[in-house]
């Protein structure tokens, strides 16, 4: 899934005009560009969590609200095409990093604070979390971008 999600986003948005990428489909919802910015910021943060778990012995990490991450990155202000290409490159680096891990590294842990009680998480937990989190957004994006059904203009005569 981690490998497929950027490709699915690219497939769903291929040929989409710029105004559609930056247009809110429904009042109060995110634009296509906002969704990509959110996924990039989550991937950055969870990738850093996994790297910290491997670099340190059971580090304590502070969870950050996804909306805060989104605002800190500036990804929303980027043009969609270059941002998607950056996401694809970032994902390739993350996958190369994860594929090189020895089996025992997937169980390395961290204590995560913020957003509730402290909890212990593993590298595997965050890799799975990221894949499932993205998949939900990609599915929603696919539904949002589906063309509206054609209306039957015949009057029944």
Model-predicted regions and their roles:
Residues 17, 65, 79, 102-104, ...:
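General structural signal for secondary-structure boundaries
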Residues 2-7, 12, 69-107:
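Acidic/histidine-rich alpha-helical segments that form the ligand environment
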Residues 17, 54, 99-102, 145:
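A structural signal for long alpha-helical coiled-coils and helix-turn connectors
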Residues 22-67, 95, 107-157:
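Short, contiguous alpha-helical
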């Amino acid at each position: 899934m981690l490998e497929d999600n950027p490709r699915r986003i690219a497939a769903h948005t291929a040929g989409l005009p710029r105004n559609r990428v930056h247009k809110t489909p429904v009042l109060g919802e995110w634009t296509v560009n906002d969704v990509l910015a959110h996924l990039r910021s989550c991937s950055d943060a969870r990738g850093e969590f996994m790297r910290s778990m491997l670099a340190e012995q059971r580090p304590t990490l502070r969870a950050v609200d996804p909306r805060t991450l989104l605002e800190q990155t500036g990804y929303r202000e980027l043009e969609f095409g270059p941002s998607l290409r950056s996401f694809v490159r970032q994902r390739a680096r993350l996958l190369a990093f994860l594929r090189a891990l020895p089996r025992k590294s997937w169980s390395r842990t961290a204590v995560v604070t913020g957003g509730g009680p402290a909890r212990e998480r593993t590298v595997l937990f965050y890799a799975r979390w990221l894949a499932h989190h993205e998949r939900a957004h990609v599915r929603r994006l696919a539904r949002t971008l589906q063309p509206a059904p054609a209306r039957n203009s015949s009057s029944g005569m």
